[in-house]
Amino acid sequence: PDVNIIGTIATGLPNITSSKSNASGDKVDRTIAYVILLAASASQLNPSLDPSSGLKVAAMPVYTAASQLCIDELFEKVEQNKLTRNKTLKPDYRKVYGKLLAAIGYPTRALKSPLFVGTGERDIDVPPKSQLALVREACDAGTKVEAHLYAGLDHSGTVNPSFKDSITFARKVLAGQPINVQCDPTPQ
């Protein structure tokens, strides 16, 4: 459709294709809930896809529960089962689920209009490292990005404090004024 997008505002920006996480492969990582949801979605789209081709045995109870739980409950289930990346993912996970990962990823990092990104420094739902990697990729692709890193805030806690900055960004974009390009934010 013909939509004139003049700017984009995002907080807690997911970067599903990033390998950057705050957790090592041996630490319990609640963001594995998203990976398991992706695997469950892939199986719904392609019932012949065997989840055990990409997920290890330890992840299967959480995988089985994924279609019945909301994300917060799934986070708890991941923590209860002490799932780490090493306990959850088989080495060829990205190969098995590659088509789905590509389909839900961003088609380009080069946006024609400016992008505002608000990231909580202590976000455990969408790791700041992966969000900031996406910011850097967008900047490198030529997108005008105004990124903010909010000190001490988590995923949900970032939304309201970011309004001051995102509203200023929106007003500038609507008025045709340049934004404050910031590709490497420091905690504020």
Per-range role (PLM):
Residues 7-13, 117, 149-150:
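Extended hydrophobic secondary-structure segments that form protein cores and membrane-embedded regions
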Residues 107-111, 141-142:
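A structural signal for short secondary-structure junctions
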Residues 1-6:
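Conserved hydrolase catalytic core segment
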Residues 11-107:
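Accessory cap/linker subdomain of secreted extracellular hydrolases
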Residues 121-126, 155-156:
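Acidic catalytic loop of the alpha/beta-hydrolase fold
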Residues 22, 93, 98-99, 132-188:
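C-terminal catalytic histidine-bearing segment of alpha/beta-hydrolase fold enzymes
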Residues 129:
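The serine-hydrolase catalytic nucleophile loop
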Residues 111, 116-123:
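Short beta-strand/loop motif that positions the catalytic acidic residue
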